[in-house]
Amino acid sequence: MTRTVMCRKYQEELPGLERPPYPGAKGQDIFEHISQKAWADWQKHQTMLINEKRLNMMNAEDRKFLQAEMDKFFAGEEYAQAEGYVPPAE
């Protein structure tokens, strides 16, 4: 049986992650409040940010920026976009 969570991003009951994606309290919070769909959407957006903004994951400031953007993304706040990116029409 699939575990469901009340997704913070989409504000509905959706299938949850199989395990925490990070160690510690942050990973547990994501595990308990973020759906598989929201996590997959974040991973796509994160990849775009890393590539378009040329972020270096060895750089602590770049990791800190990405962490802050992840928090905004899941909270439904305004978050950084790749400049010039237009999402495909659905």
Swiss-Prot record:
<protein>
    <recommendedName>
        <fullName>Probable Fe(2+)-trafficking protein</fullName>
    </recommendedName>
</protein>
<dbReference type="InterPro" id="IPR007457">
    <property type="entry name" value="Fe_traffick_prot_YggX"/>
</dbReference>
<dbReference type="GO" id="GO:0034599">
    <property type="term" value="P:cellular response to oxidative stress"/>
</dbReference>
<dbReference type="InterPro" id="IPR036766">
    <property type="entry name" value="Fe_traffick_prot_YggX_sf"/>
</dbReference>
<dbReference type="Pfam" id="PF04362">
    <property type="entry name" value="Iron_traffic"/>
</dbReference>
<dbReference type="GO" id="GO:0005506">
    <property type="term" value="F:iron ion binding"/>
</dbReference>
<comment type="similarity">
    <text>Belongs to the Fe(2+)-trafficking protein family.</text>
</comment>
<dbReference type="GO" id="GO:0005829">
    <property type="term" value="C:cytosol"/>
</dbReference>
<comment type="function">
    <text>Could be a mediator in iron transactions between iron acquisition and iron-requiring processes, such as synthesis and/or repair of Fe-S clusters in biosynthetic enzymes.</text>
</comment>
<keyword id="KW-0408">Iron</keyword>
